[in-house]
């Protein structure tokens, strides 16, 4: 009898590294997770230690195999999904990072972004990279590192330094420096990549003064990139055969591979993606045009709206405000009151993402009266996640001309039934919650498994996409629009807060 085979998905996130083992029926066999330190050197700055990312991720791989009691030669392939945009520059010779990883949430490059806008590059960048000018993306982060680490730009020109997003860093480490690659989805988040020619964009490299020598090779999201024996007893070589940025992996894991299908992931931030097939739709409404995975991991396009603060705003209630002891408590307290008593929380702690793109917005609570208590504020914070999702969906429908019939959801916060019901109420659309919650890992596993023939095609995977619960709108249109108008008013007042503070 042949040994049973499995796929391992490595899910390197913003706050933790995880490893997930799946069998052929897409059942989760075991999960291992390790958190790592968030570094905040200055207000609005966010960093990670790349060596800690590697240490936590590699140890979860060893751990998850031990937990599942399977040997490395039972692993058919490894797929990688990762926090996107986070930027690492390291020495080719030693593998030592020259600076901490600059995280996607970090706003330190706002000034560089202002220069790009003043130089009239907005339309060029939107047309060619699909992105807006914002500190969120990797390009300005790489420039910042090269500007601030002495001699680094010259070293990069000499081929001594390498740049990578987290996927690239992990594969480089897993292959002992033999493989320096990324995939189309991650490359499309750098602001350095032309999403039409599918190559690094010479003009952007010139504008940001980033040497081409340091960039990884860009490949499909589903193919064999190299082999690793990390965690392997006796040096079994396991193919690494799937890479996708976390949101594109979730889109694929939800099997949103046809034009017009959309999903929203509720994690640290909120990310809604709608597959637009082989057509790159240029957004007129503050969304991003990004690369997604087609049915066999080939290039498709998607519209994306990124909301920076979703689960992070619940953590704020817990860690800074001390209003709850556990994120799961938020649902209980939110349902202790009938409504928010007129309160709106705008969680613009690091500015606002889509469709506003205002790095100078700041968090605010509006509508406070004497009768407002902690439960109202907890409820309003949860509701802010759903309102921000509606902001994005409105923009998406305007750009694509496609009316969404159902939204597939995933991520930690979807366990919150209050939030999911309110989401359906405020959108006026069905919300579908899948049985398998680990859709990001699932997407990475699918991409890796398809590349090595573990699964033959997507038809084989369709029956595994079971919807566990469907939420339907329970409020009238007038009420929905009235509440949403209040939210829009609150957002308007939170915008451009920081820039007047000379």
Curated annotation (Swiss-Prot):
SUPFAM superfamilies: Actin-like ATPase domain (SSF53067). The modification N6-malonyllysine is found at residue 233. GO terms for cellular component: cytosol. Changing residue 231 to D: Displays an increased enzymatic activity and a decreased allosteric regulation by FBP compared to wild-type. It catalyses: glycerol + ATP = sn-glycerol 3-phosphate + ADP + H(+). ATP binds at residues 14-16, 268, 311, 315, 412. The keyword Transcription does not apply. Pathway: Polyol metabolism; glycerol degradation via glycerol kinase pathway; sn-glycerol 3-phosphate from glycerol: step 1/1. Homotetramer and homodimer (in equilibrium). Heterodimer with EIIA-Glc (crr). Binds 1 zinc ion per glycerol kinase EIIA-Glc dimer. The zinc ion is important for dimerization. Belongs to the FGGY kinase family. This is Glycerol kinase. It comes from Escherichia coli (strain K12).
């Amino acid at each position: 009898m042949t040994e049973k085979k499995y796929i391992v998905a490595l899910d390197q996130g913003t706050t933790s590294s995880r490893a997930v083992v799946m069998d052929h029926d897409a059942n989760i066999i075991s999960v291992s997770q390790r958190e790592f330190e968030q570094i905040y050197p200055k207000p609005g700055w966010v960093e990670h230690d790349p060596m800690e990312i590697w240490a936590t991720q590699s140890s979860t791989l060893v751990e998850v195999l031990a937990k599942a009691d399977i040997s490395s030669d039972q692993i058919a392939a490894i797929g990688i999904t990762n926090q996107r945009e986070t930027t690492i520059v390291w020495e080719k010779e030693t593998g030592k990072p020259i600076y901490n990883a600059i995280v996607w949430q970090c706003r330190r490059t706002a000034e560089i972004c202002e220069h790009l806008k003043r130089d009239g590059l907005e339309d060029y960048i939107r047309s060619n990279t699909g992105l807006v000018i914002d500190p969120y993306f990797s390009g300005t982060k790489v420039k910042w590192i090269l500007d601030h680490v002495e001699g680094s730009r010259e070293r990069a020109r000499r081929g001594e330094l390498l740049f990578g997003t987290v996927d690239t860093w992990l594969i480089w480490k897993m292959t002992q420096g033999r493989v320096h690659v990324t995939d189309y989805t991650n490359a499309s988040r750098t602001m350095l990549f032309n999403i039409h020619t599918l190559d690094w964009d010479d003009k952007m490299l010139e504008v940001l003064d980033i040497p081409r020598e340091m960039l990884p090779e860009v490949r499909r999201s589903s193919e064999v990139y190299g082999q690793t024996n990390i965690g392997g007893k006796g040096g079994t070589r396991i193919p690494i055969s799937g890479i996708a940025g976390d949101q594109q992996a979730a889109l694929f894991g939800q099997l949103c591979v046809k034009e017009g299908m959309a999903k929203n992931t509720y994690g640290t931030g909120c990310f809604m993606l709608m597959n637009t097939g082989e057509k790159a739709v240029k957004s007129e409404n503050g969304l991003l045009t990004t690369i997604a995975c087609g049915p066999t991991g080939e290039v498709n396009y998607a519209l994306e709206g990124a909301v920076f603060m979703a689960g992070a705003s619940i953590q704020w209630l817990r860690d800074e405000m001390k209003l709850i002891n556990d994120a799961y408590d938020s649902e209980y307290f939110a349902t202790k009151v009938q409504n928010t008593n007129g309160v709106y929380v705008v969680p613009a702690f690091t500015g606002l993402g889509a469709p506003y793109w205002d790095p100078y917005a700041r968090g605010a609570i509006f509508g406070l009266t004497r009768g407002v208590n902690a439960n109202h504020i907890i409820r309003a914070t949860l509701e802010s996640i759903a309102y921000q999702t509606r902001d994005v969906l409105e923009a998406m429908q305007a750009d694509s001309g496609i009316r969404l019939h159902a939204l597939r959801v995933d991520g930690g916060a979807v366990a919150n039934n209050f939030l999911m019901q309110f989401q359906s109420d405020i959108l006026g659309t069905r919300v579908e919650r899948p049985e398998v919650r680990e859709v990001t890992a699932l997407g990475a596993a699918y991409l890796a498994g398809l590349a090595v023939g573990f699964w033959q095609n997507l038809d084989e995977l369709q029956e595994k996409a079971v919807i566990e619960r469907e939420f339907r709108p329970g409020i009238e249109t007038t009420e929905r629009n009235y509440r949403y108008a209040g939210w829009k008013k609150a957002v308007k007042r939170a915008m451009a807060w920081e820039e007047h503070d000379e």
